């Protein structure tokens, strides 16, 4: 019998993916990465660890609905995505409402998105997007490792933690929602 299905979006070199799969042998972990060089490193790591419950997909995140059926995933991890800091690129952020809509279509009702970033402005933007979409945010922290290391860390996370950079984290409960209407663009948005 197939256990819970977890998806690690943009798994990078696979430290988090491999350690999560090793700690949870009863789950099926699907790792998505569009950079083939990073994915090869991740795959070699999983093979060296003898992991049988992790699979890798070379895919752009935008195509998630082409790979997964409706309400198939139990948990989706988004760890340290590109912040796309310019306002005009907000739609490229992996926590923008159109991405959230796609995620909530493939994540089971009541399933979760676990989200981590070192980028405070991106985190605030993301929390606002979650709220605008009517999604429940829980276990929100702006300094995850303040009192010691919590959970499995990504490679980026280890580096940022060593530098003393606070790690922002939250969990988002997925449910059906209607995409909020797009706001009218202003000259300031083009920055």
Model-based region annotation:
Residues 1-7, 15-22, 44-70:
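S-adenosyl-L-methionine
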Residues 10:
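Conserved S-adenosyl-L-methionine
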Residues 35:
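Conserved SAM/SAH-binding beta-strand->alpha-helix loop
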Residues 39-40, 123:
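Short alpha-helix immediately C-terminal to the canonical SAM-binding loop
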Residues 95-109:
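A short glycine-rich, Lys/Arg-flanked "PGG" loop and its adjoining helix->strand segment in the class I
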Residues 110-117:
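Conserved beta-strand signature within the Rossmann-like core of class I S-adenosyl-L-methionine
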């Amino acid at each position: 019998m197939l256990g819970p299905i977890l998806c690690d979006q943009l798994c990078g070199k696979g430290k988090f993916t491999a350690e999560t799969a090793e700690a949870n042998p009863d789950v099926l972990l699907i790792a998505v990465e569009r950079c083939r060089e990073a994915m090869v490193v991740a795959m070699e790591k999983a093979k060296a660890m003898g992991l049988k419950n992790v699979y890798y997909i070379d895919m752009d995140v935008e195509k998630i609905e082409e790979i997964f059926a409706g309400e198939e995933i139990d948990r989706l991890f988004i760890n340290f995505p590109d912040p796309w800091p310019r306002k005009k690129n907000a739609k490229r952020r992996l926590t923008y409402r159109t991405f959230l809509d796609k995620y909530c279509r493939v994540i089971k009702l009541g399933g979760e998105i676990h989200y981590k970033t070192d980028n405070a402005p991106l985190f605030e933007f993301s929390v606002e997007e979650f709220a605008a979409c009517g999604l429940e945010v829980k276990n929100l922290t702006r300094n995850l490792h303040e009192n010691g290391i919590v959970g499995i860390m990504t490679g980026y996370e280890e580096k940022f933690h060593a530098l003393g950079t606070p790690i922002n984290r939250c969990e988002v409960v997925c449910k059906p929602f209607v995409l909020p209407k797009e706001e009218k663009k202003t000259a300031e948005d083009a920055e």
